[in-house]
Amino acid sequence: MKRMLYLLVVALIAGVCYSEKAFAIGAIAYSDPDEMYGFCLNEKDKTSAKLCAMTQCKDAGGEKCQFRVWFDGCGAVAVSKKYFGAGWGTSQSKAEAMALKQCGSGCEIAASHCEK
């Protein structure tokens, strides 16, 4: 009986740990006219991640913040004086490469993070 209880506790703990990782969501919002962005990590769902990114963008001074992307791995923002790119992927380098590709020439990575 103790063994069965032990296995049940281990299974529950493993499920909770897996669930927390599986539902950690990040999001990016961007305001074109003033080149401000919001970047959020480790939110419980897409709605929370989107709201967090929009709030951060507005708090940074963004006047026309728009939600751009959410992700459950790594996310990156690339910017130049004229362009913006958002990327995501299973690694930081993949997210950054996508952001740079979407942004175009003359862009640099402004922020890049991975869910933990």
Per-region residue spans from a language model:
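Bacterial N-terminal signal peptides
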Residues: L8-V16
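Helix-coil modules at protein/domain termini and other flexible surface or pore-lining loops
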Residues: K2-Y6, Y18-K116
